[in-house]
Amino acid sequence: MHLHVILLFSVNLLYLLQPTITVNAPTNETDRLALIKFKESITHDPHMMLSSWNDSMHFCNWFGITFTCGRRHQRVTALDLQGYKLRRSISPHISNLTFLRIIYLQNNSFYGKIPHDVDHLFRLEEVYLNNNTLEGEVPSILSNCSNARIINFNWNELNGKIPAELGSLKKLKLLRLGVYNLTGRIPPSFGNLSSIRVLSLAINKLVGNIPYRIGHLKSLVYFSISSNKISGTIPSSLYNKSSLQIISVSVNQLNDTLPANIGLSLPNLKVLLFGSNDFSGPIPISLCNASQLQILDLSEKKFSGLVPTNLGNLPDLHWLDLSNNYLGRSLDFLKSLTNCIKLDKLDLSTNQFGGVLPIPVGNLSTQLTELYFEANEISGTIPITLGNLVNLIGLGMDDNLFTGLIPTIFEKFQKIQVLHLNGNRLLGELPTFIGNLTQLFLLDLDEIGRAHV
């Protein structure tokens, strides 16, 4: 719950390189007039980025414009105006730039609908319209842009169903249609996107099942459908997709058990986000074979049994969330986690862990910033070795059976902001050193007083 993530990872840096295109000095009146109309449609240009778009210079030298010069054509091939807070609807005259291959209009304030004449841009390869306030439906006529390799419409206000026609884009490598109000099902035709590497449909209102053929996409590296209403099970074909590095299906209505061999069939896995679904069963021991795993979220489910003691074999693990399950009672796996020297966040809250907190807990990574044990049945005194975790920002140990005094070693927590120890059997008065924790803004100690610092 504390570490719940809906990861929308910035894979653009991993999988996409913006091209460098040679600028020449051609002339083409059709393109010039289209650019003039585009400028006229802009009502807000706070950085004056379009001030060069005038007759004082040849339009091939206008800011954000790239030309190519060939034997037959001297045409605009790229429009790059990303991140300048430009405002207005996107001019339909952009469709007259028929040699456009690249459109970078992300991170602006464009609104209205995506021009329906975009299919005239049949040479289009990359289009970034993410981080605007565009509305309406995703144009099905985008399927006519058969050379499209990248379509990124994330973070807009689009609605309606995802066009099944997009499944015909055989060259498409990245498709991001996340953070909208898109409805309906994931089109089965997406199983035909034979070149797709990144498929992100997160944070919508999609329903139905995951199409089985998604698991047959041989190049798929990143798959995200988090925060929808997808139900059913995850296709076995997806579990066997060895190219996958990131799987994010958290906050849906999926139900299943994890395959025993998941760590063997997904050896390149780096991120596994399964939180807030209806999965059950044991946590597979084979996960330790996914040696590149960095983030593992199995929270808010019905996982049961013991936590594998070999998770310490994951050298790059820095985020582990096992909260809100039926795991327990042994905490022996904590000793193994001391090998995870990059561990930054650990959430074991709301399970059935019992017994005393092992002394090796103080040998967890010194990079640890968040540690949560609350709502378990852990007893005994708080080990003084916890004081070794000097970079803690959040520590939750509430609603357990801890006894004794608050260790004075907690004085070392000079970065601590949130400290929950309520609902235990702690004794004594509020330690005076608490006043020296200058970053602390929430201290909860109901057994010996409640204070907000």
Task: Write out the residue ranges for each language-model feature.
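Plant-biased, solvent-exposed loop and capping regions
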Residues: 1-452
